[in-house]
């Protein structure tokens, strides 16, 4: 329930706005299912954060979702966040999946974590076509793939 105090705070404080570009990468057919996740954050068109991480034993969808969760977590509470992603699955899982989460819902742990973070922020999604020349999407794609390749190399015997 929105209170008068909430309305006053929302109208008198300029919210910070962020554009977050995210990507995940994984070889779902590999025995180790190595992957990588990456995000890049812009505030007023200026890059303020860029991170990536290697993910062992993951899936492509989980890597995409982890990248989004990491970007949302970076942004301050009460900020307005636009997530730019090429993952239709992640958008569907985070934005559309309204049913009660149970253990049989794939990636329910990540959906729950996203919901907890997003409840404190104003998050929206923009789908971008992957590998189509979007500058920032190409950057995070390269970052996620680099982490995937590093993980793959580190697991070689």
Predicted feature descriptions by range:
Residues 19-31, 69-143, 147-148, 152-154:
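RNase H catalytic domain
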Residues 2-62, 66, 73-75, 142, ...:
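RNase H-like nuclease fold core
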Residues 1-2, 131:
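N-terminal hydrophobic targeting segments
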